[in-house]
């Protein structure tokens, strides 16, 4: 149970998210004396939930908090960086997507590259004032897509090295 909590918490961390938690789950399984005690399927479910849990809060509150903190003495650099990242993500989505904005959001979140996860995608959707329900569906789809891609890559890598599948 403790290992599921680890991957759950890791999946909630910005910039790491699901993309980092899935390889950790594979590593946990590889390091266990009795790997049958740790189900990768349950780990995927726990990781996806952990990755999605902060998303509604990010959509509704992150932009306000970041705007508030951008002129505060100690935190302004980090908050300004986050605001710029959200603006840039939103601009990229809008430039490349045109009318297919929600499909672009799904792909933005779903292609596992650094800085393109659920946190950044949701922040970009918030900055673009996109519809909440449609954005959440796109982000959920993107998280599922990223999970499949990272899972396949981990299965190939860890399977070849440790015999895990």
Put a short name on every predicted segment.
Residues 18, 55, 147-151:
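Hydrophobic transmembrane alpha-helices of multi-pass small-molecule transporters
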Residues 1-9, 28-107, 133-134, 140, ...:
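Membrane-interfacial helix-loop-helix
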Residues 12-25, 112-123:
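Transmembrane helix boundary and interhelical junction motifs in multipass membrane proteins
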Residues 125-148:
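Interfacial loop-to-transmembrane junctions
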Residues 37, 113-115, 130:
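Transmembrane helix interruption/hinge and helix-loop junction motifs
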Residues 27-28, 110, 127:
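Alpha-helical structural context
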